[in-house]
């Protein structure tokens, strides 16, 4: 038999079936059952502490809520679409289990502040998982950097060979990106984990409630300052989705490089078979599908952020039913982020880099040309003059189809008589790396400092 609407006292007609289906949220917001139960238990305890309910009533409520949680987790809970959402389903079931005391749970509370609390707890719980996954991924980048700190490859600008860099420097660049993501998620969580319970529908309540007790019970960082803002605020969802968008953007940049580097024309990286697929017609193919799919999933996360911004655009105070649409963008994004971070961590740990291919690519692009220009400056040329002279020497090497370091001293001196035999030491790629001693540079000492700094931060 269909359940009566808990709000249905002033209505004489039942809700049309298509409307019931159209307006329900139970099909997806039941994901928040644990947060809803935790919030209700804290609320019930507060009502007892304030003398609004008896200790016996509070105990009944708490035991009933525990029973409901067990039913949900054993897949025996009777979800009912006519009860619309997770909140009403749980409250109705509570009354079935413990009788009319269950009807007292909602004292001093509205679904408006209840759903805001549930969603804040859900977002907070899950972005905390993002943070842990990011820390794991950073640790793998740091470990790979240690493994390949003596490996040199072309650094690129405009996707053209530019200067030699340590592979460790390249990998650590991503570690620093994801470190910023950790910081963003942490700072976001400070604003997410603020309790709105006690705001009621929009204007507060006449009951002698204690919002600070509830916040403390739920390990929140504070309580709301304005009841109207508390029930209508979804900035925290937007902020979490922005954090997710930046995380996915960073993942997509690394995915793009894995895709390019795994191309035989580069051959810098060997993708594990477990993270690649083949072709239905071309038996030789090994496609970087995992990286491509992850790169493609960025669009759905960006879309979720834009979705939320649009939902809130021009929305008047306070609660409007539009806000029901705030859940699915975050739910979908949360699934995408957690799966992407998990798969990237496993894939990165299994990847091997081709040192020989990277070494051979250095000579193809005359990546030690900047070293030659700097060398000429030490011989008394202005940088602009050194730049022009180096360009002429590169042209000579191109004409002979050899790397700079294979030119003879006579070849060098035919263009600039200030060049001496010590030029060959300067043109060595390992020397080039070591000479980059500036803060944050690709020099070996800088690499060691970066690794130490990140390791120290990861253990804090």
From Swiss-Prot:
The record's keywords, sorted A to Z, are: Amino-acid biosynthesis, Arginine biosynthesis, Cytoplasm, Lyase
Q: Could you tell me the EC number(s) of this protein?
A: 4.3.2.1
Q: Where in the cell is it found?
A: Cytoplasm
Sorted alphabetically, the Gene Ontology BP terms of this entry are:
arginine biosynthetic process via ornithine; L-arginine biosynthetic process
GO cellular component, alphabetical, reads: cytosol
- Pathway membership: Amino-acid biosynthesis; L-arginine biosynthesis; L-arginine from L-ornithine and carbamoyl phosphate: step 3/3
User: Out of the domains of life, which is the source?
Assistant: Bacteria
Q: Which PROSITE patterns match?
A: FUMARATE_LYASES
Name the reaction it catalyses: 2-(N(omega)-L-arginino)succinate = fumarate + L-arginine
GO MF entries: argininosuccinate lyase activity
**Per its UniProt entry, what is the enzyme's top EC class, as one word?**
lyase
Pfam (any one): Lyase_1
User: Which InterPro entries does this UniProt record tie to the protein?
Assistant: Arg_succ_lyase_C (IPR029419), Argininosuccinate_lyase (IPR009049), Fumarase/histidase_N (IPR024083), Fumarate_lyase_CS (IPR020557), Fumarate_lyase_fam (IPR000362), Fumarate_lyase_N (IPR022761), L-Aspartase-like (IPR008948)
Q: Which family does it belong to?
A: Belongs to the lyase 1 family. Argininosuccinate lyase subfamily.
This one is known as Argininosuccinate lyase
Organism, scientific name:
Lawsonia intracellularis (strain PHE/MN1-00)
Q: What is the lineage of its organism?
A: Bacteria, Pseudomonadati, Thermodesulfobacteriota, Desulfovibrionia, Desulfovibrionales
Q: Coding gene?
A: argH
């Amino acid at each position: 038999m269909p359940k009566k609407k808990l709000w249905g006292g002033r209505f004489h007609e039942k809700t049309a079936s298509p409307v019931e289906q159209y307006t329900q949220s139970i099909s997806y917001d039941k994901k928040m059952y644990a947060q809803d139960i935790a919030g209700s238990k804290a609320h019930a305890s507060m009502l007892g502490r304030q003398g609004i309910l008896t200790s016996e009533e509070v105990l009944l409520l708490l035991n009933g809520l525990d029973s409901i949680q067990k039913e949900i987790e054993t897949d025996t809970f009777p979800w009912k679409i006519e009860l619309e959402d997770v909140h009403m389903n749980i409250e109705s079931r509570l009354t079935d289990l413990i009788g009319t005391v269950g009807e007292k749970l909602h004292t001093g509370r509205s679904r408006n502040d209840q759903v805001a609390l549930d969603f804040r707890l859900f977002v907070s719980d899950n972005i905390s998982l993002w943070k842990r996954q990011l820390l794991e991924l950073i640790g793998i980048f740091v470990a790979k950097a240690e493994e390949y700190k003596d490996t040199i490859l072309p650094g690129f600008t405009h996707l053209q060979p530019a200067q030699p860099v340590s592979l460790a420097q390249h990998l650590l660049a991503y570690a620093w990106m994801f470190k910023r993501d950790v910081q963003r998620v942490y700072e976001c969580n400070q604003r997410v984990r603020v309790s709105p319970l006690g705001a009621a529908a929009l204007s507060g309540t006449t009951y002698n409630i204690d919002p600070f007790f509830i916040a403390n019970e739920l390990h929140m960082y504070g309580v709301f300052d304005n009841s109207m803002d508390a029930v209508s605020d979804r900035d925290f969802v937007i902020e979490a989705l922005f954090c997710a968008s930046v995380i996915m953007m960073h993942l997509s940049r690394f995915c793009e490089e894995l895709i390019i580097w795994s191309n035989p024309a580069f051959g810098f990286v060997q993708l594990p078979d477990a993270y690649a697929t083949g072709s239905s017609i071309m038996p030789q193919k090994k496609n970087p599908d995992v990286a491509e799919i992850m790169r493609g999933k960025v669009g759905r996360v960006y879309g979720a952020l834009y979705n939320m911004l649009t939902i809130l655009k021009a929305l008047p105070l306070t609660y409007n039913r539009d806000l029901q649409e705030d859940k699915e963008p975050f739910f979908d994004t949360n699934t995408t982020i957690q799966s992407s971070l998990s798969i990237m961590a496993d894939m990165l740990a299994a990847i091997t880099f081709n040192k020989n291919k990277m070494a051979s690519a250095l000579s193809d692009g005359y990546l030690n040309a900047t070293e030659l220009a700097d060398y000429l400056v030490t011989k008394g040329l202005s940088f602009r003059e050194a730049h022009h002279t180096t360009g002429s020497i590169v042209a000579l090497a191109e004409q002979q189809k050899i790397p700079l370091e294979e030119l003879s001293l006579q070849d060098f001196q035919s263009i600039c008589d200030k060049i001496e035999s010590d030029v060959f030491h300067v043109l060595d790629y390992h020397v080039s790396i070591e000479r980059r001693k500036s803060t944050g540079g690709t020099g070996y000492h800088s690499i060691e400092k970066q690794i130490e700094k990140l390791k120290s931060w990861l253990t804090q």
